[in-house]
Amino acid sequence: MNKQITSSVVLGLALLNVCASVEAKPPTCTQPVGKWKNRQKSVVEIKTYDAATGAISGEYTSHSGASASSVPYPVVGWMNSAPAEPSAPGKAGKGHHAEVITFEVSWGALGGISAWTGTCAVNSQSSGLEQISAVWHTTQPNTGFEWDHTLTGSDRFDPIE
């Protein structure tokens, strides 16, 4: 009986060691599940990605604006891709390929909704890492001015390793 317990403990420790040595990989454009952080330190965490349909879901934790808190808000969205089109002799091909992405957040009791639409591709101008570059629109029901219900800007999300 003691030998069986000792064997179980040794096996358990070996499995624990293997699991601890497996490093989590940062998300990529083709495997987007994971955390992505923008310049304001807000984080979108893509928890599920269905490659067949392109559906994504997860959570967004904002560190800017009225929604700044540690409370995560639900994210829904889509990714879509077509195969890269190589250049052909005598034909101006499309020389850059990117995954396309859109995701939305409803800010609950705050009443607003934000949507990001853009691309996920390698940023050749900086680190060479993949990143999400998107434009965003935020709509809010209560503002000081009629023109202030929809705000627009741009954002960049880098993978968190």
Give residue ranges: language-model regions.
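Bacterial N-terminal signal peptides that target proteins for export
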Residues: 1-9
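Serine/proline-rich low-complexity intrinsically disordered segments, especially terminal tails, linkers
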Residues: 9-10, 116
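Bacterial N-terminal signal peptides
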Residues: 10-17
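Boundary at the C-terminal end of the N-terminal hydrophobic targeting segment
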Residues: 20-24
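Central antiparallel beta-sheet cores of small beta-barrel/beta-sandwich binding domains
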Residues: 27-124, 136-138, 158
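Edge beta-strand at a domain terminus
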Residues: 75, 79, 129-161
